[in-house]
Amino acid sequence: MFQLLIPLLLALKGHAQDNPENVQCGHRPAFPNSSWLPFHERLQVQNGECPWQVSIQMSRKHLCGGSILHWWWVLTAAHCFRRTLLDMAVVNVTVVMGTRTFSNIHSERKQVQKEEERTWDWCWMAQWVTTNGYDQYDDLNMHLEKLRVVQISRKECAKRINQLSRNMICAWNEPGTNGIFKVLTPAQPPPPSRETVGHLWFVLFMEPRDSSKWVSSVGA
């Protein structure tokens, strides 16, 4: 299972930001509906709420979601690509960013080149879904949707997962709402202390069978 969790890193071709030192990774504006919503509600993401979320597309069709890790790098699931980028027509692979819907044809596109258990304040999953009223295969009419989940303890998680490593956390929808159990792996080690975190957001890997739809993030 560990091998399936290995991420695929895609390099972005283009100009880096002029002043990257002024950009604080993991920070975004506060949104009023991020803390009090019931766990089972799915809502369209507001503009700027998930600035790290992108759409990886093949021949202008949505392939998989991804998260910006760096101004040159995007993280996505390796199983989204049945072949390596060396075997693919790379010119047809693009990353769409800066939008929450695909109906905007002016969205920015970038060409792709070849120990101690921590409790998070919030845990959200984001998914690209087809807009109501459109065909599910119409990839130009999709929007970003979010779902809040709750973290469960390692002891409870271990009852469901046989090979639960120390760098994994588990979360699921609120009990009684037909929630799906998730296993998440942080993309980087947790910070040393809560005081240094503030309101940073961290990207998590999704357990393989679910990761084609959802990209998770947590806020401390």
Swiss-Prot record:
One Gene Ontology cellular component: extracellular region
Q: Where is the signal peptide?
A: 1-16
User: What keywords tag this UniProt record?
Assistant: Disulfide bond, Glycoprotein, Secreted, Signal
Q: Domain (Peptidase S1): give its ranges.
A: 23-220
Output the Gene Ontology terms for molecular function. Answer: serine-type endopeptidase activity
- What are its GO biological-process terms? proteolysis
Q: Where in the cell is it found?
A: Secreted
Top-rank lineage group of the source organism: Eukaryota
Q: List the disulfide bonds.
A: 64-80, 157-170
* Glycosylated residues, chain numbering: 33, 92
Q: What is its main location?
A: secreted
Q: Tell me the protein family, please.
A: Belongs to the peptidase S1 family.
Entry protein name:
Serine protease-like protein 51
